[in-house]
Amino acid sequence: MLYSIDNIAPDCNQANFIAPNATVIGNVQLEQDVSIWFNVVIRGDNDPIKIGAGSNVQDGSILHTDIGAPLTIGKMVTVGHKVMLHGCSISDHCLIGINST
């Protein structure tokens, strides 16, 4: 599901796959060939979230921001199952392991 918040809608036009029960909210930009898997929540309500080309966010992960703390994921990144990312930057070609916080 895609939701706008404060009249800002997610930019997911280039994404390769968004699971039907994933939730993408607000100021979120998904670059080319990004995949968002089942039960993922990406909440760009306070600051922007950008996910780089070829990256994937796996089942049950939660990505969100805080005021002054945007979230940026580089290119070709794998965010493993049930990962919690809050207002951080991940470089290109990284693997964030299962259950990481």
Question: Where are the language model's segments positioned?
Answer:
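Extreme N-terminal tail/first-helix region
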Residues: 1-16
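A structural detector for short beta-strand units
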Residues: 10, 47-49, 69-71
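Left-handed beta-helix
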Residues: 14, 19-20, 25-26, 31-32, ...
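Conserved protein-kinase catalytic-loop segment immediately C-terminal to the catalytic Asp
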Residues: 101
